């Protein structure tokens, strides 16, 4: 054996070099194979995916243990990428943990993939084969910032304004803060001579507006092109500190307000007051109302007082024009609209509230009652006395231009459909004018609906039922209980077909009145103090002293808003 071996000098070198070389190569090769096979780097995976992308279908299963993803794991994947652990990695967690499944599907020419169930999905091969470096893919900018979208919206707004070109003074101008696409509310008029429906009937009502109203608005007010714009602004575009309502500040007045400085509440009230005073002489119905449909977190009481101060001090209440001509009463409405919201004109004589509570079925009036109301409206056209404290010479005569007498309270409420007016609290109550010429309660055609008043004293809002003083606002003298409910119900509640006289009937009438409230103000003072009011409504006749629980004081203490 020794003869077969090489020389002693070369033996150790050859054996050592061979063994070291052999073992070293084997260890290095095994390590290299393990690194490439079991631990592929993301760069290698990316290169492999690009290399195999042209093959129809290539699946490579790494030799390590592969776990089949269960349903709960599949639900946590987005486009095959696990979103549970490594959220921002463009590669699956199986590849990151050196084990898993890699499948590359060849992209068809049309970039449409058919799923197993037959559904199709379109995708972009560039975005799939080249995952983004950033944590998230670059998203297209917001659609609100696209100039093309804004230009398209402006074109639509212009086209929409051109379709309404038959009423040029009503062209909508977008105030600040309102994007053009959301401000396409139809301009409409509140004057609907024949009861054409709610103001929500946009396009139908638009073509039926009284033509004289449009001419009056276009001639007398050239600087105000928005006399009665869309009555409702979208709720989604309004800041949380702006009251969006259907009646407080119309879109027309909002467009004419000054935008150079931040709007102050007093300046807004002043501008609205001027607007109402200029609008008071027009033959159309004014848009200044003492009503807030959707009060916002900004100082509700301030806004209520501000809006009602406008409707209270803008113009003294004129004589109801329905006394002279019942069919033209809509042209002589005062600066305060009924707080019952949108109204219908059933026959041009009376207006009934249109929105009823869901738990109360509206009682429809028959023709007999309407005939009574028309007769009352026609009989109330007596000659008004010169002074406010003039006595009634006849049962149907009026007491003065600013004071509505006992008989005239009903026709004015019938014809003008004026409900209560929210007023700021006065420092001292206004004495009511005495009427001493009424020996007994007069019989009305529908007199069984009303209770007689107190002893020759006509109660007025915020009055102590004593003395006489000038009065600028109408009052409700004929409530169902005889009580001067200043936060009274809608006008239709006074004329419900109902029960006869007596305390029980009065209580029923009051409860019906409470349930019949349909405006945007639900009178909480009724429900809170109903028992006290019922007990005081049927006291013995006599001069009443101001009571802290009276409905007038209640109205001051509890401004009735939802």
Swiss-Prot record:
Stretches for region Disordered: 147-242, 537-562
Annotated Gene Ontology cellular component terms: nucleoplasm
Entry coiled-coil feature ranges: none
Chain intervals with Low complexity compositional bias: 147-167, 183-201
Domain of life of the organism encoding this protein: Eukaryota
Family, as annotated: Belongs to the FAM222 family.
Protein name: Protein FAM222B
Organism: Mus musculus
Gene: Fam222b
